[in-house]
């Protein structure tokens, strides 16, 4: 049952690319709508049933949660922007580099030891990532995504921000439950997003009403049934298991993109993506809990 929930979370999270592609909102507005609708769904439960937990908050937890929220906002913004310039498959597979960034941070900051086999898989995954980034240069691909390299760069940036907010959140989650942590996380992210909107003077309203449905889909499927169920799954599986199953996300995203938009990545990207998934999986198994 719990394994089904884990795969369901992965599938729901993969719908993020589809809803983002369907929407014609500016990325910053799409992000604001997604966060606001998510909070409308999540905050009432947290404030009614978990409000006593807010007493556990101290200065350190507040700072870490705020920083995590900032990184989460930049992660989603980079992800949405990447989808405007590159294909769904390439963007999602490159976001999987989050696992590699986490390991690099732990190696540099926590002085984590990596086995010889782990280093081999780590280096191979970087090679595969290079071929994903450099792929898709055919005439057809260039015509559809003339700035694909920019999109892939933004996808790598999204992976970096994801790694940072994951590491910060992992510490905070030791003291706060999932509803309280995610409510605080999304609140901080929304505040940062609204500040950017105000500074850039981007209109909040006046867009096609169907964009509201896409934003609601992002909030419910990708966030509530996606990211939140991942956090729930960590109570029943080791983090290595959750990370391994999350690697199926690009597969789900690519299938949905093919069904919805007829998007098919180049042969090089497909081969490099499969190689990257297996090398990251191999690394996770070498370094698992």
Regions found by a protein language model. Name each.
Residues 4-5, 29-48, 120-127, 150-157, ...:
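Hydrophobic alpha-helical transmembrane segments of multi-pass integral membrane proteins
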Residues 42, 114-137, 247, 256, ...:
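Hydrophobic transmembrane alpha-helices of multi-pass small-molecule transport proteins
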Residues 45-46, 98-123, 251-271:
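C-terminal transmembrane-helix exit sites in multi-pass transporters
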Residues 12-25, 30, 37, 77-86, ...:
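Juxtamembrane C-cap of transmembrane helices in multi-pass membrane transport proteins
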Residues 1-32, 67-70, 74, 78, ...:
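Glycine-/small-residue-enriched transmembrane alpha-helix faces in small-molecule transporters
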Residues 14, 18, 69, 73-77, ...:
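Hydrophobic/small/kink-forming positions within alpha-helical transmembrane segments
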Residues 49-90, 94, 131, 219-237:
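Specific transmembrane alpha-helical segments of multi-pass solute transporters/efflux pumps
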Residues 91-97, 168-190, 223-259:
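Helix-helix packing/entry segments at the starts of transmembrane helices
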